[in-house]
Amino acid sequence: MLNERFSILVLLLILLTFSLG
């Protein structure tokens, strides 16, 4: 299972990707 911090980092990266794209 993934750590909570890792999943939060992934969500932030996805949000940054969508905002930049």
From Swiss-Prot:
<keyword id="KW-0624">Polysaccharide degradation</keyword>
<dbReference type="GO" id="GO:0045493">
    <property type="term" value="P:xylan catabolic process"/>
</dbReference>
<keyword id="KW-0119">Carbohydrate metabolism</keyword>
<keyword id="KW-0378">Hydrolase</keyword>
<protein>
    <recommendedName>
        <fullName>Endo-1,4-beta-xylanase A</fullName>
        <ecNumber>3.2.1.8</ecNumber>
    </recommendedName>
</protein>
<comment type="similarity">
    <text>Belongs to the glycosyl hydrolase 10 (cellulase F) family.</text>
</comment>
<keyword id="KW-0858">Xylan degradation</keyword>
<comment type="pathway">
    <text>Glycan degradation; xylan degradation.</text>
</comment>
<keyword id="KW-0326">Glycosidase</keyword>
<dbReference type="GO" id="GO:0031176">
    <property type="term" value="F:endo-1,4-beta-xylanase activity"/>
</dbReference>
